[in-house]
Amino acid sequence: MYNYFYQGHLVRKCLGQHFLHDQNIIESIVAVIHPLPSQALVEIGPGLGALTKYVAKYVKTITVIELDHNLVAYLANHPILQHKLNILSQDVMKVNFSDLAKKLSQPLRIFGNLPYNISIALMFNLFRHIHMIRDMHFMLQKEVVSRLLAKPNNKNYGKLSVIAQHYCQIDLVLDVPPESFRPVPQVDSAVVRLVPYVIPPYPVKDINKLYLLTSLAFQQRRKTIRNSLRNLFSVEQLLTQGIISTLRAENLSVEQYCCLASTLAECLPKK
């Protein structure tokens, strides 16, 4: 075990810190985000400001969310950024993004190099505030991006795929090799764009039922739907939805999960 310093900062592995340093990648990400002066830009995990500095050229203010107090102090005293940043020094998992959007008087444009150790949990949290988000651009582990984009009948297809694709149009923007970071991670990364649907292609009457269904179905993904959802649907009820009960969780489409969730919402009281 040894300490790793980057630009004088002690990297905290417990926070999943990997700092982007590749100039070409940074400029490509900013071009994709295409920030405009009047927009509410929010960066998660700004780190040492590698991406922040370039986005700041186009906007008056950026809200940044950073847990590491050493990095907060660095950003607060940054010669270029200090007058442009609204710094939230807190755990991003505890941020109420709906309240933040109301405070900024418009939907949020959220971006960042997400910490590997909380990226999936954070996205599920963000989906709960989706009505207050304009778009999201995230650097993620390539494996997580594969899960976001996965289609049925694929081993990467799961709860994250269904929930994310219900809420958003998702596009792979850029592949990012490990050597673009310091310290160098042991995984490949990619930048993904998520744009919330104004009207979801597959509406759901109660989103909590979709969360429940996908949790049960993918908890033991090798089980048949008949077994994993046996406490919610009979074989006959599944057939009325056009679903063969011997299929497995990964065989059902996003549309089918959404239809099942709406059917369930009609049968079970909303909680």
Swiss-Prot record:
Pfam families per record: RrnaAD
Gene3D superfamilies to which the protein is assigned, alphabetical: Ribosomal RNA adenine dimethylase-like, domain 2, Vaccinia Virus protein VP39
Keywords linked to the UniProt accession: Cytoplasm, Methyltransferase, RNA-binding, rRNA processing, S-adenosyl-L-methionine, Transferase
Top EC class, one word: transferase
Listed EC numbers: 2.1.1.182
Gene Ontology terms, MF aspect: 16S rRNA (adenine(1518)-N(6)/adenine(1519)-N(6))-dimethyltransferase activity; RNA binding
Reaction catalysed by this enzyme: adenosine(1518)/adenosine(1519) in 16S rRNA + 4 S-adenosyl-L-methionine = N(6)-dimethyladenosine(1518)/N(6)-dimethyladenosine(1519) in 16S rRNA + 4 S-adenosyl-L-homocysteine + 4 H(+)
InterPro entries, per the entry: KsgA/Erm (IPR001737), rRNA_Ade_diMease-like_C (IPR023165), rRNA_Ade_Mease_Trfase_CS (IPR020596), rRNA_Ade_methylase_Trfase_N (IPR020598), rRNA_adenine_dimethylase (IPR011530), SAM-dependent_MTases_sf (IPR029063)
Binding site for S-adenosyl-L-methionine: H18, L20, G45, E66, D91, N113
Presence of the UniProt keyword Methyltransferase in the record: yes
Location in or out of the cell: Cytoplasm
GO-annotated cellular components: cytosol
Summary of the function given for this chain in its UniProt record: Specifically dimethylates two adjacent adenosines (A1518 and A1519) in the loop of a conserved hairpin near the 3'-end of 16S rRNA in the 30S particle. May play a critical role in biogenesis of 30S subunits.
Family, per entry: Belongs to the class I-like SAM-binding methyltransferase superfamily. rRNA adenine N(6)-methyltransferase family. RsmA subfamily.
PANTHER family for this protein: DIMETHYLADENOSINE TRANSFERASE (PTHR11727), DIMETHYLADENOSINE TRANSFERASE-RELATED (PTHR11727:SF7)
Full protein name: Ribosomal RNA small subunit methyltransferase A
Organism field: Baumannia cicadellinicola subsp. Homalodisca coagulata
